[in-house]
């Protein structure tokens, strides 16, 4: 649900007097690993997509566990407000889990049809986050900002999955091993 970048932004913007150790080099390490694997079929930005997908699972689990009391009906003024809260959170969580499942299967199956399904799941997740934003704006204004941690990154990943040359070669034409040489020419080795 929440992307890796979104969690970093959220962590950076939180104002707490408590000392919280951070690891600012995490994004640099992710970039180094993903860039270093750019000649692999699942490398470069595509590997970074999976990096944020699985780190998003860890962050979502951590946020869910630390805020589990938010899902208890007794913490709300009325039953209607509790149902609105569930309507604003559960669909986005469910679409994220579906995206995680489809993305994981896509790693081994690598078919164009499954990629199209992944795109539709991301579209549904964005739509759910937009509906969640509308509900939150009316009933839970403190939660509105969190929805943009889903809408913005997922929109960017959707654009990537729609336009990427790598994605087309890996999932549609299945010729990445040939295409990689024109996209990322091998560096000539210096004889010693």
Where are these regions (language model features)?
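Topology signature of small-to-medium multi-pass alpha-helical membrane proteins
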Residues: 5-192
